[in-house]
Curated annotation (Swiss-Prot):
Origin superkingdom: Bacteria
Keywords: ATP-binding, Cell membrane, Cytoplasm, Membrane, Metal-binding, Nucleotide-binding, Protein transport, Translocase, Translocation, Transport, Zinc
Main localization (coarse): membrane
Designated name of the protein: Protein translocase subunit SecA
A GO term from the CC aspect: cytosol
UniProt entry tagged with the keyword Amino-acid biosynthesis: no
InterPro entries, alphabetized: Helicase_ATP-bd, Helicase_C-like, P-loop_NTPase, SEC_C_motif, SecA, SecA_CS, SecA_DEAD, SecA_motor_DEAD
Topology class, membrane: Peripheral membrane protein
């Protein structure tokens, strides 16, 4: 391990040495750039583009391009890139992760590689964690790009197609990870080329890369539609599980985040429902409801996992503490929580399209990222994303003091001690930032501080609109701020306060903006600058910002992020964690020896302990959890890779159809595939030709690819299998040619595209559901001494092939039955295509001699029952 670390440090030192040489090259160009007029500096952009067109590489252009951006930034924003920021920019351009400590100006660093790569004209995406940061950075850094003649776009929630399309066509586009991912999924559900907004995925720079690629790696982006199911059962089961006794009727495994009913519990539920066997086939839906209700009751905690706001259950992001509007738990869990809380149950949803961040961002040709804490997860970045981490030195030496952890026996004693520590430091005027792991804990601590008469600000997911403003002032004299986890990430805490925010606040009270009255804004800024400068001196004398962690997170990286809020850019600062043996990490993963040690020492509740054994035990517990989480993410990726290959295949074919790449060829290929499969089914290999089911084949042909044919079994007799396929394919294509003459080529091409896209989307949706069910049950194969992943791969390929066959069959059936459709009738055709298919499995040929029952599938091929389709007026 030590050898590995030594190599790692040596590698990083070598990397810094290499980067220093390039930085010197950029610095040597600075005097030359300073002599240029604004017009001459701006003209450099056109010159660089011409040089790229002539074959010059971006690496060759880098020193000059970076020097141009640095000079533009100095003129436009009054901010000159430091040497360490230039290093960060080079690392990002090379498709790596730059670890830069909090306050080192990551936002400004991104302008360097963004400008250089945007010169190709292929578009650069800068990805942030929330809408506020995306807007702020697009507006703030956008001034540099616009000065240099590049366009800037912004992609946030709630924009329409035209706005998004324009934003993606810009040279540099800012947006959130969610929006980029959802736009990709929406593009792959588009029915018309005009609805597609994204260009190719060329280069992405991810801010807070650890948050997006690691913390959210297991969170899939899902676009869903409503499924037609009643919600009554959720209320029924919410009442039932409230009557069950924990430990007696069900068991909870907090480590595995699982809950299981016991035999006694199952009997109790059966009695309440008045049924004999809950696990009988016909009660499968009931077991699903019971499991969801138990999870909602026993595992999901209000104000920790979710909040109830305006009659809605809203998920809380466990890593940032932010509310995740629009996100819902899947598999009925969200509905079960709604029933538990007694709010209106939203319709259960069906997945229409899904992708994980892991797979979305791996599609970019070049990927880079920035964060203050990546080193602890370097292994994961390299293994999963093929991204190496370079630790960039700080501009000024770090002088923050990280004090040893203080451990208490109970949570009550811990919070009591925290309040005492806050009161002691607050008396001196030192600013304090307290990090909590949940909304519930932050509100509890807030109540305790209120009772002590300590004024403070609470920053949690419930008030994230005020996030940046509160965080920006957390460094003021006497400020006490409670923040859940990493809420407010991306906003610097300036010692003494942020004069710009204070000036803006006062302007807002007057109902004005800086654009309305620039003179007044400048006056206010000068006034507050004087105040904050005075406060800055006092705060520095008091030791800077003090961080109090109320609990160790299961990831060391999150703890480091909290600590990193203090001691920015050479400022003084300090940090300390207060821990109790009742904290989740200690309870679930800590050693039992610690409680024993405290008992042996005869310590009472209020006496803290600082002991090397305990510090080691905490670190061991964190490493254990980190390794477990890495294994889970790796495991998720292995399964998702199977799905990803299928998604890429479906989406690439879908795009070809969407953009009209010879759709007729697609249709012909589908006809050939359908005919070949039909001949294989009715005339199997190894069966004598005299025993072939030619009658069945012709009935199937009539139903699918040759409606109204006049062929008889005798016409097909004495023909070899290959010749039979060729004969039927030719007949089907001839028939389709007639359809084209009747309808007109242009109208048919439009309908072909529409039918193919709709059928593909329908079948893909069903396939996603089936794959989810397969994945949920596949773990049981391990009991049969089989590798679940291998089994999953085998079965998913079979399911995928079946889906492709079903797509081909349905498309051919619909297109063959499109007799002359006049313009006003197009909507009816679309309704037929959009209708959900009710039949599962291979569709049986329609037999002409049979009487059609009212509940039989309609022979027109719509998939509806006869009584609801052509037989409606019969």
């Amino acid at each position: 391990m030590l050898k590995f670390l030594k190599n790692l440090l040596d590698d990083n030192a070598r990397e810094i040495k290499r980067l220093t040489a390039r930085v010197e090259e950029i610095n040597s160009l600075e005097p030359q750039m300073q002599k240029l007029s604004d017009e001459e500096l701006r003209a450099k952009t056109g010159e660089f583009k011409e040089r790229i067109a002539r074959g010059e590489s971006l690496d060759e252009l880098l020193p000059e391009a970076f020097a141009v951006v640095r000079e533009a930034s100095r003129r436009v924003l009054g901010m000159r890139h430091f040497d360490v920021q230039l290093m960060g920019g080079i690392v990002l351009h090379e498709g790596k992760i730059a670890e830069m400590k909090t306050g080192e100006g990551k936002t400004l660093v991104a302008t360097l590689p963004a400008y250089l790569n945007a010169l190709t004209g292929r578009g650069v995406h800068i990805v942030t964690v929330n809408d506020y940061l995306a807007r702020r950075d697009a507006e703030w850094m956008g001034k540099i790009y616009k000065f240099l003649g590049l366009s800037v776009g912004l992609v946030v929630h709630g924009m329409d197609y035209a706005e998004k399309k324009a934003a993606y066509l810009a040279d540099i586009t800012y947006g959130t990870n969610n929006e980029f991912g959802f736009d990709y999924l929406r593009d792959n559900m588009a029915i018309h080329p005009d609805q597609v907004v994204q260009r190719e995925l060329y280069y992405a720079i991810i801010d807070e890369v650890d948050s997006i690629l690691i913390d959210e790696a297991r969170t899939p982006l899902i676009i869903s539609g409503e499924a037609e199911k009643s919600t009554d059962l959720y209320y029924t089961f919410a009442k039932i599980v409230k009557q069950l006794v924990p430990g007696e009727d069900y068991t909870v495994d907090e480590k595995a985040h699982a809950v299981m009913p016991t035999e006694a519990g199952i009997h109790k539920v059966e009695k309440m429902l008045g049924i004999q066997n809950l696990y009988a086939d016909e009660h499968m839906e009931l077991t699903h409801h019971l499991n969801a209700a138990l999870k909602a009751q026993a595992l999901m905690k209000r104000d920790r996992d979710y909040v109830v706001k305006d009659g809605q259950v809203i998920i809380v992001d466990e890593f940032t503490g932010r509310l995740m509007f629009g996100r819902r738990y899947s598999d009925g869990l969200h509905q079960a929580i709604e029933a538990k809380e007694g709010v209106k149950i939203e319709q259960e949803t069906q997945t229409l399209a899904t992708i994980t961040f892991q797979n979305y961002f791996r599609m970019y040709e070049k990927l880079a990222g920035m964060t203050g804490t990546a080193e602890t997860e370097e292994n994961e970045f390299r293994k999963i994303y093929n991204l190496s981490v370079v630790v960039i030195p700080t501009h000024k030496p770090m002088i923050r003091k990280d004090l040893p952890d203080v451990i208490f026996k109970t949570e009550k004693a811990k919070f009591k001690a925290i309040v005492e520590e806050v009161a002691r430091r607050h008396q001196t005027g030192q600013p304090i930032l307290i990090g909590t792991i949940s909304i519930e804990k932050s509100e509890m601590l807030s109540e305790m501080l209120k009772k002590r008469g300590i004024p403070h600000q609470v920053l949690n997911a419930k008030y994230h609109e005020k996030e940046a403003e509160i965080v920006a002032q957390a460094g003021r004299l006497g400020a006490v701020t409670i923040a859940t986890n990493m809420a407010g990430r991306g906003t610097d805490i300036l010692l003494g306060g942020n004069p710009e925010f204070l000036a803006l606040q006062e302007l807002r009270k007057m109902g004005k903006t800086p654009e309305d009255d620039p003179e007044l804004y400048r006056e206010l800024l000068a006034k507050y600058k004087k105040i904050t400068d005075e406060e800055h001196k006092k705060v520095v004398e008091l030791g800077g910002l003090h961080i109090i962690g109320t609990e160790r997170h299961e990831s060391r990286r999150i703890d480091n992020q909290l600590r990193g809020r203090a001691g920015r850019q050479g400022d003084p600062g300090s940090s300390q964690f207060f821990i109790s043996l009742e904290d989740d990490l200690m309870r679930l993963f800590g050693s039992d020896n610690i409680a024993g040690l405290m008992d042996r020492l005869g310590l009472d509740e209020d006496t803290p302990i600082e002991h090397p054994l305990i510090t080691r035990s905490i670190e061991t517990a964190q490493k254990r959890v980190e390794n477990r989480n890495f294994e889970i993410r790796k495991h998720v990726l292995e399964y998702d890779n199977v799905m990803n290959q299928q998604r890429e295949l479906i989406y690439s074919q879908r795009r070809r159809v969407l953009f009209g790449e010879d759709v007729l060829t697609f249709v012909h290929q589908m006809i050939e595939a359908v005919v070949e499969r039909a001949v294989d089914t009715y005339c199997p290999d190894g069966v004598h030709p005299e025993e072939w089911d030619l009658k069945g084949l012709l009935e199937y042909a009539h139903n699918v690819f040759l409606p109204n044919h006049q062929l008889t079994p005798e016409d097909l007799a004495d023909t070899g299998k290959k010749a039979l396929v060729e004969f039927l394919v030719e007949k089907a294509k001839e028939y389709y040619k007639k359809r084209e003459e009747e309808l007109g080529g242009e109208q048919l091409r439009e309908l072909e595209r529409y039918v193919i896209l709709r059928v593909v989307d329908e079948k893909w949706m069903d396939h996603l559901d089936a794959m989810d069910q397969l994945r949920e049950g596949i773990g049981l194969r391990a009991y049969g001494q089989k590798d679940p992943l291998v089994e999953y791969k085998i079965e998913s390929v079979e399911m995928f092939n079946n889906m492709i066959a079903a797509i081909q069959e349905d498309v051919v059936r619909y297109l063959m039955r499109l007799s002359v459709v006049r313009q006003p009738e197009t909507r009816r055709v679309r309704r037929v295509v959009e209708n959900r298919y009710q039949e599962e499995g291979p569709k049986k040929p329609y037999r002409r001699e049979q009487k059609i029952g009212r509940n039989d599938p309609c022979p027109c091929g719509s998939g509806k029952k006869y009584k609801k389709c052509c037989g409606r007026n019969g």
